[in-house]
Amino acid sequence: MANLKEIRDRIKSVKNTRKITEAMRLVAAAKVRRAQEQVLRSRPFADRLARLLENLQARMRFEDADAPLLEDRPLETVTLMAVTGDRGLCGGYNANIIKRTEQRFEELQSKGYKVNLVLIGRKAISYFTNRSYPIQATFTGLEQVPTADEAGSVANEVFAEFLSETTDRVEIIFTKFINLVSCKPVVQTLLPLDPQGIADADDEIFRLTTKDGDLRVETGSAPANAQPELSSEIVFEQSPDQLLNALLPLYLQNQVLRSLQEAAASELASRMTAMNNASDNAKALAKTLTLDYNKARQAAITQEILEVAGGAAAVG
């Protein structure tokens, strides 16, 4: 009977664990939906800003203008920004970013460049600090739906380093959100800036629904926002280089914000997938344990019957 009690306790523990993972899955699903909506809401502004910068750059080709954030100088020092989460329970999300950062760090060092790290998220900070990597700055406690203020504080750090020529290039490593089951670590150059458009056409969007009590995902496509071209006859009161130097920091902040938003959506999607797998595994394990319990109980009952029958035969 002790064996039966152990199995019952395991079944109870597995079912309680499944309740927790299912709740975490639903919370992550709700948050990843909000993260996606934030990206879509910010896209029209990003599109218009990118087109304006392209227009200004085109005019500056014929003028002797100075834009420090566009300066492509000889490469000696590179700053790598790695974006991870503050928490775990999200599958391989954090490990994949850390692995890609190490690979890029070694690639740059093998070419003779000095490399510094700017780390976002406790997982990256803990890993690289324990291994004595050169860390320039760290950021923690960012919201799961990143804000412009948070992106501004991160952008200002690398902005100052680039303008002071402490670093010659800034790259950001984050997880690009493709869809709910697919995320990819990518490396993008932040500085020097190269505004060439930042919105992807026909991004996948999704709707969370329920069917037979289970969470379901319906996917679809969101067409890119059609923005009218800027007229070449627009007259600016300020010179193009003044406007460009005023808008480029805003563009940099927007790029950082979009990267943080992509990373946040990827983390939440990874957590939702991990918790979904954990819930499915818990359900399967509970089913297996229930079968084991029934077999053990049946065997115990059979044994008792045999003992009673044997005792009766002995008495008779």
Curated annotation (Swiss-Prot):
Gene Ontology CC entries for this record: plasma membrane-derived thylakoid membrane; proton-transporting ATP synthase complex
Lineage, highest ranks first: Bacteria, Bacillati, Cyanobacteriota, Cyanophyceae, Synechococcales
Its membrane topology: Peripheral membrane protein
PANTHER family: ATP SYNTHASE GAMMA CHAIN (PTHR11693), ATP SYNTHASE GAMMA CHAIN, CHLOROPLASTIC (PTHR11693:SF41)
Organism: Synechococcus sp. (strain WH7803)
Domain of life: Bacteria
Location (main, coarse): membrane
Name under which the protein is recorded: ATP synthase gamma chain
One term of GO molecular function: proton-transporting ATP synthase activity, rotational mechanism
Encoding gene per record: atpG
Subcellular location(s) of the protein: Cellular thylakoid membrane
Assembly: F-type ATPases have 2 components, CF(1) - the catalytic core - and CF(0) - the membrane proton channel. CF(1) has five subunits: alpha(3), beta(3), gamma(1), delta(1), epsilon(1). CF(0) has three main subunits: a, b and c.
Keywords, ordered alphabetically: ATP synthesis, CF(1), Hydrogen ion transport, Ion transport, Membrane, Thylakoid, Transport
InterPro entries the record matches: ATP_synth_F1_ATPase_gsu, ATP_synth_F1_gsu, ATP_synth_F1_gsu_CS
Protein family (similarity comment): Belongs to the ATPase gamma chain family.
Function comment: Produces ATP from ADP in the presence of a proton gradient across the membrane. The gamma chain is believed to be important in regulating ATPase activity and the flow of protons through the CF(0) complex.
